[in-house]
Amino acid sequence: MSRRSLTLLKNLARNANGSGIQTRSVTYMPRPGDGAPRAVTLIPGDGIGPLVTNAVEQVMEAMHAPIFFEKYDVHGEMSRVPPEVMESIRKNKVCLKGGLKTPVGGGVSSLNVQLRKELDLFASLVNCFNLPGLPTRHENVDIVVIRENTEGEYAGLEHEVVPGVVESLKVITKFCSERIAKYAFEYAYLNNRKKVTAVHKANIMKLADGLFLESCREVAKKYPSITYNEIIVDNCCMQLVAKPEQFDVMVTPNLYGNLVANTAAGIAGGTGVMPGGNVGADHAVFEQGASAGNVGKDKIVLENKANPVALLLSSAMMLRHLQFPSFADRLETAVKKVIAEGKCRTKDLGGTSTTQEVVDAVIAKLD
């Protein structure tokens, strides 16, 4: 048999068992002009923020991603987000930010909350999932926590009634409850998710959380193909640490979502690897998923050992939001390869690598 015939037979055999089939998916057909570079507002923030945002900048440059950053210095001790920063976000529609430290107590409000309220970023989304190669107590965890971002206990409606007595108001409206429920079910529908769980405390807060549940139930009727159930928040936390694989998409009021997302992140590998973002009708802000106020310890900053994985994955979410799916896939795949390989991991993941070493490893894995 000739060498040419032997080669043809080998190729036929490879195609027959599937190993020669290309893995590229059905092509993404962009609209004319979709490849034009997009401006993104960049807020490095406090603590580890500049380290991890710089990691994103390096990877984007290595990928030749069609975005460019407008960088602004914003810090948690500021009383307000500077007007020029808000103007940039409103113009660009998209922002990537590091952690902004929130002072505990005192009269300084959280800039993270200010951004959400002023831009009407009504939905916070945190994706908590197992990364191949990263050992955790539980397997098959893939939870999306969707949290109402603009009202509830975080509305900031507090005052001192008389000396020594402080009143803090929890505000729940039908409009905001329906809006977040619609977003959760729409997300589940568009991402082939099978179940939405509403988290509440309506057994005690019968009017406020009762209104939230009523709104979720009304929206659920419009999505008969998606299973809907409800769970009390304290039982939810217990179930999360016992059997997290039972959850799919979770929709919550503001405070509960913060607690649930951080718990789910801890179960799936830690806040250092969980992506997330905040979205409204017109704007989106992407950040480390489970803790917007996480600025790390001074020692981590001094040693340059901040974990950039969460913000890199959040950047992949941002690229999909900007209609650059192939760049998002390349970035996400490279990050997952580095985690699976296990050679470059920061201290929170059981390694000794620096931020730069992780960045270099991700860049080396880019297709």
From Swiss-Prot:
Transit peptide: 1-25
Keywords assigned: Magnesium, Manganese, Metal-binding, Mitochondrion, NAD, Oxidoreductase, Transit peptide, Tricarboxylic acid cycle
Source domain of life: Eukaryota
One cellular component (GO) term of this entry: mitochondrion
Tissue note: Ubiquitous. Predominantly expressed in roots, stems and leaves.
Compartments (UniProt record): Mitochondrion
Family annotation (Pfam families): Iso_dh
A molecular function GO annotation: isocitrate dehydrogenase (NAD+) activity
Biological processes annotated in GO: isocitrate metabolic process; tricarboxylic acid cycle
Subunit structure: Heterooligomer of catalytic and regulatory subunits.
Function: Performs an essential role in the oxidative function of the citric acid cycle.
UniProt family annotation: Belongs to the isocitrate and isopropylmalate dehydrogenases family.
Protein name, UniProt field: Isocitrate dehydrogenase [NAD] regulatory subunit 1, mitochondrial
